[in-house]
């Protein structure tokens, strides 16, 4: 009996050690499974990030993807031009050359016939080029913060000859610039730094609807919240009395201080910094923030002020907001995501008691 008891006593510590090792292994494995929730107001750059993750961490776009995005490029381009033409009468702007009226009618007819996803005919391409070169159209484009216009409009309209070529095939950059409204939940899986990522883009989601599903994501590792810096002087599509950045601030407040995300890391992506840097020279930040009193609209100071406004929404003394400024440039976002991943690894291991 004494020998048996002694053997049991000796076995107990080793069993406990095995349990500890098993718990540690499970913790390490759990720390390797990363769920990221992508949130932000409409047109804040969420879909672009999903596409960039596909380029960086998967095999990029397939031949079928390139084929499917071709009509999207055509539609985005002509719809952007139409948005400018429609805004001209509202803003009291006329064509510099009256001959452009017939060109405008041709473009409107294409939309009326729902042929905006078709390749441009030679006549249509020539009309679009003449319209884009018209001084009146350019004046209206310069006031695009006063109406709704895709921020990729200039990118595509400046390159009409390439888009209008008979053998045109979209580039990766073209696909990144396209705008397709996200419906439902988009899920992307990829591996990076020995981690297994699941990235969820839940689209726009009305505030009233958000309450119904937000708790389903309480176990996410981190939230990436996207803000379009360049939209500080624009209003919402659905409510043209509400400033887009002010709406983003409200949404960020509701997410950052949500009871479901008390222990969730929050990464703030201030997107479209390239467009913001260009716009801040001519459109004052006071449109969104009247209290911003700098006489000279300098990019660095203005960007820092926007960042401070979002960070000030954090009511927690223990939660840290990890902020990064990003552009449409994939190389820039690869560097940013690399830094973000290091933060996620450290926080996840710490949460499992392994760091």
Swiss-Prot record:
<feature type="region of interest" description="G5 motif">
    <location>
        <begin position="326"/>
        <end position="330"/>
    </location>
</feature>
<comment type="function">
    <text>Guanine nucleotide-binding proteins (G proteins) are involved as modulators or transducers in various transmembrane signaling systems. The G(o) protein function is not clear.</text>
</comment>
<keyword id="KW-0564">Palmitate</keyword>
<dbReference type="GO" id="GO:0007188">
    <property type="term" value="P:adenylate cyclase-modulating G protein-coupled receptor signaling pathway"/>
</dbReference>
<feature type="binding site">
    <location>
        <begin position="40"/>
        <end position="47"/>
    </location>
    <ligand>
        <name>GTP</name>
    </ligand>
</feature>
<dbReference type="GO" id="GO:0031683">
    <property type="term" value="F:G-protein beta/gamma-subunit complex binding"/>
</dbReference>
<dbReference type="InterPro" id="IPR027417">
    <property type="entry name" value="P-loop_NTPase"/>
</dbReference>
<feature type="binding site">
    <location>
        <position position="47"/>
    </location>
    <ligand>
        <name>Mg(2+)</name>
    </ligand>
</feature>
<dbReference type="GO" id="GO:0046872">
    <property type="term" value="F:metal ion binding"/>
</dbReference>
<keyword id="KW-0342">GTP-binding</keyword>
<keyword id="KW-0460">Magnesium</keyword>
<dbReference type="GO" id="GO:0005525">
    <property type="term" value="F:GTP binding"/>
</dbReference>
<feature type="lipid moiety-binding region" description="S-palmitoyl cysteine">
    <location>
        <position position="3"/>
    </location>
</feature>
<feature type="binding site">
    <location>
        <begin position="201"/>
        <end position="205"/>
    </location>
    <ligand>
        <name>GTP</name>
    </ligand>
</feature>
<dbReference type="InterPro" id="IPR001019">
    <property type="entry name" value="Gprotein_alpha_su"/>
</dbReference>
<feature type="lipid moiety-binding region" description="N-myristoyl glycine">
    <location>
        <position position="2"/>
    </location>
</feature>
<feature type="region of interest" description="Disordered">
    <location>
        <begin position="1"/>
        <end position="24"/>
    </location>
</feature>
<dbReference type="GO" id="GO:0005834">
    <property type="term" value="C:heterotrimeric G-protein complex"/>
</dbReference>
<feature type="compositionally biased region" description="Low complexity">
    <location>
        <begin position="1"/>
        <end position="17"/>
    </location>
</feature>
<protein>
    <recommendedName>
        <fullName>Guanine nucleotide-binding protein G(o) subunit alpha</fullName>
    </recommendedName>
</protein>
<comment type="similarity">
    <text>Belongs to the G-alpha family. G(i/o/t/z) subfamily.</text>
</comment>
<dbReference type="GO" id="GO:0003924">
    <property type="term" value="F:GTPase activity"/>
</dbReference>
<dbReference type="InterPro" id="IPR011025">
    <property type="entry name" value="GproteinA_insert"/>
</dbReference>
<feature type="binding site">
    <location>
        <begin position="201"/>
        <end position="206"/>
    </location>
    <ligand>
        <name>GTP</name>
    </ligand>
</feature>
<comment type="subunit">
    <text>G proteins are composed of 3 units; alpha, beta and gamma. The alpha chain contains the guanine nucleotide binding site.</text>
</comment>
<feature type="region of interest" description="G3 motif">
    <location>
        <begin position="197"/>
        <end position="206"/>
    </location>
</feature>
<feature type="region of interest" description="G4 motif">
    <location>
        <begin position="267"/>
        <end position="274"/>
    </location>
</feature>
<feature type="region of interest" description="G2 motif">
    <location>
        <begin position="174"/>
        <end position="182"/>
    </location>
</feature>
<feature type="region of interest" description="G1 motif">
    <location>
        <begin position="35"/>
        <end position="48"/>
    </location>
</feature>
<keyword id="KW-0807">Transducer</keyword>
<feature type="binding site">
    <location>
        <begin position="176"/>
        <end position="182"/>
    </location>
    <ligand>
        <name>GTP</name>
    </ligand>
</feature>
<dbReference type="Pfam" id="PF00503">
    <property type="entry name" value="G-alpha"/>
</dbReference>
<keyword id="KW-0519">Myristate</keyword>
<keyword id="KW-0547">Nucleotide-binding</keyword>
<dbReference type="InterPro" id="IPR001408">
    <property type="entry name" value="Gprotein_alpha_I"/>
</dbReference>
<dbReference type="GO" id="GO:0005737">
    <property type="term" value="C:cytoplasm"/>
</dbReference>
<dbReference type="GO" id="GO:0001664">
    <property type="term" value="F:G protein-coupled receptor binding"/>
</dbReference>
<feature type="binding site">
    <location>
        <position position="327"/>
    </location>
    <ligand>
        <name>GTP</name>
    </ligand>
</feature>
<keyword id="KW-0449">Lipoprotein</keyword>
<feature type="binding site">
    <location>
        <begin position="271"/>
        <end position="274"/>
    </location>
    <ligand>
        <name>GTP</name>
    </ligand>
</feature>
<feature type="binding site">
    <location>
        <position position="182"/>
    </location>
    <ligand>
        <name>Mg(2+)</name>
    </ligand>
</feature>
<keyword id="KW-0479">Metal-binding</keyword>
């Amino acid at each position: 009996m004494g020998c048996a008891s002694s053997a049991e006593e000796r076995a107990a510590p080793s069993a406990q050690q095995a349990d500890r090792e098993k718990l540690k292994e499970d913790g390490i494995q759990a720390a390797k499974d990363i769920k990221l929730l992508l949130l932000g107001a409409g047109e804040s750059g969420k879909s672009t990030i999903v596409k960039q993750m596909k380029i960086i961490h998967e095999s990029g776009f397939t031949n079928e993807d390139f084929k499917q995005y071709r009509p999207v490029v055509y539609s985005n381009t002509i719809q952007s031009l139409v948005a400018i033409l429609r805004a001209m009468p509202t803003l009291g702007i006329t064509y510099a050359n009256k001959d452009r009226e017939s060109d405008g009618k041709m473009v409107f007819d294409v939309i009326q016939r729902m042929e905006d996803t078709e390749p441009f005919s030679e006549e249509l391409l020539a009309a679009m080029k003449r319209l884009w070169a018209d001084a009146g159209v350019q004046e209206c484009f310069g006031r695009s913060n006063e109406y709704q216009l895709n921020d990729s409009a200039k990118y595509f309209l400046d390159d009409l000859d390439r888009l209008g070529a008979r053998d045109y095939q979209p580039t990766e950059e073209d696909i990144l610039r396209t705008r397709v409204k996200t419906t439902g939940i988009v899920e992307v899986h990829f591996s990076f730094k020995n981690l297994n990522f699941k990235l969820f883009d839940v689209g726009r989601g009305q505030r009233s609807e958000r309450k119904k599903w937000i708790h389903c994501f309480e176990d996410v590792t981190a939230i990436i919240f996207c803000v379009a810096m360049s939209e500080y002087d624009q209003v919402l599509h659905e409510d043209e009395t509400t400033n887009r950045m002010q709406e983003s601030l409200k949404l960020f407040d509701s997410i950052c201080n949500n009871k479901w995300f008390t222990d969730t890391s929050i990464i703030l992506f201030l997107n479209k910094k390239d467009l913001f840097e260009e716009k801040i020279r001519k459109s004052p930040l006071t449109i969104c923030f009247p209290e911003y009193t700098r006489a000279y609209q300098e990019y660095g100071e203005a960007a820092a002020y926007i960042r401070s406004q979002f960070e000030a929404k954090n009511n927690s003394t223990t939660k840290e907001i990890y902020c990064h400024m990003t552009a449409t440039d994939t190389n820039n976002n690869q560097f940013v995501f690399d830094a973000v991943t290091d933060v996620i690894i450290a926080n996840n291991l710490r949460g499992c008691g392994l760091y």
